[in-house]
From Swiss-Prot:
Protein name: UPF0761 membrane protein Patl_3954
InterPro entries on file: UPF0761_bac (IPR023679), Virul_fac_BrkB (IPR017039)
Organism lineage: Bacteria, Pseudomonadati, Pseudomonadota, Gammaproteobacteria, Alteromonadales
A Pfam family matched in the record: Virul_fac_BrkB
Cellular localization per UniProt: Cell inner membrane
Family as reported in the entry's similarity comment: Belongs to the UPF0761 family.
Membrane-spanning ranges: 46-66, 103-123, 138-158, 184-204, 214-234, 248-268
Annotated source species: Pseudoalteromonas atlantica (strain T6c / ATCC BAA-1087)
Length: 300
């Protein structure tokens, strides 16, 4: 009986706070116009897709250790991050990258600039969500962009190698633990998504971010990303009306819609991280004020 009373009191104390938190989250999403920002980033992403992937694999090709896992990296990118039509899109992108690689030094440099512009747009959008007033020095900003562009491919390559080792280990343990390989294949992409969201929310904002808040936002972003992939794949598979309308060109709207949904997920995770920080900051100020008012020795 006492436990029921305790849980009832806990619910009464937390329900109003949960209501305030949800309203704050919705208001922040509406204020920042994440649907409009996601559309802008989706458009820029599609324009930057070929330059970014070309720079990505050019950096990887400089390291012979990653040459053997290039196919696995492509499968990771197009299989896990683009549900359905991944093989078709992969073929188109590979052809575009092959054509772009025949360009001269000036053309390749322009592709690098386009890839950096994509990172710049992501940076500005996330900093607008966090309301970062101060701007970084240009040299520092360029250094961060370049670090993301160069270290990003290396981190993904290392994650693929580690995933291969984990899956191989799971295969060897399959005889002792049934379903180990299947579980590993499901867990590793999710953990990789959480790490990617966490790094994004920690590094990009020009503010000090609490790692715990960023981890919550990263976990929610990765969860929404996985659910979006399942839902999008289900819709594409069971309601193929887009193929009747667009025919052979159906892959283009599919890719655009998926990139748009992906950016909405990224921005929702960023908003959640920011709202958690604002909510706990306001709550701590309210608690401090309440304690100060209840203290009889506090100055009038």
């Amino acid at each position: 009986m006492e436990s029921k009373v305790i849980w009832s009191d806990v619910l009464r104390s937390w329900l109003p706070k949960a209501n305030i938190f949800v309203r704050m989250f919705v208001n922040h999403c509406q204020r920042d116009g994440i649907t409009v920002s996601a559309g802008h980033l989706a458009y820029v992403s599609l324009l930057s897709l070929v330059p970014f992937i070309m720079v990505f694999f050019t950096i990887l090709s400089a390291f012979p250790a990653f040459s053997e896992v290039r196919g696995d990296i492509e499968a990771l990118i197009f299989g896990n991050f683009i549900p359905t039509s991944g093989d078709q899109i992969q073929g188109y992108v590979a052809e575009f990258v092959g054509n772009a690689s025949k360009m001269g030094a000036i053309g390749i440099l322009s592709l690098v600039v386009v890839a950096l512009l994509l990172i710049s747009n992501i940076d500005k959008t996330l900093n607008r969500i966090w309301q970062a007033k101060s701007e970084r020095p240009i040299i520092f900003t360029f250094a961060i962009y370049w670090m993301i562009l160069t270290l990003g491919p290396l981190l993904i390559g290392l994650s693929v190698i580690m995933s291969s080792y984990l899956v191989a280990f799971a295969n060897s343990a399959e005889a002792y633990t049934m379903g180990a390989t299947t579980a590993m294949l499901k867990i590793v992409p999710f953990i990789a998504s959480v790490c990617a969201f966490f790094i994004l929310y920690m590094i990009v904002p020009n503010k000090r971010i609490n790692p715990r808040h960023a981890l919550v936002g990263a976990f929610m972003g990765a969860l929404l990303f996985e659910l979006s992939k399942k839902g999008f794949s289900f819709y594409i598979t069971h309601f193929p009306s887009y193929q009747m309308i667009y025919g052979a060109m159906a892959v283009i709207p599919i890719l655009f819609v998926w990139v748009y949904l992906s950016w909405i997920v990224v921005l929702l995770g960023a908003e959640l991280t920011h709202v958690i920080e604002v909510f706990f900051h306001e709550e701590s100020k309210e608690n401090f004020t309440q304690v100060d008012e209840d203290d009889p020795q506090s100055p009038a």
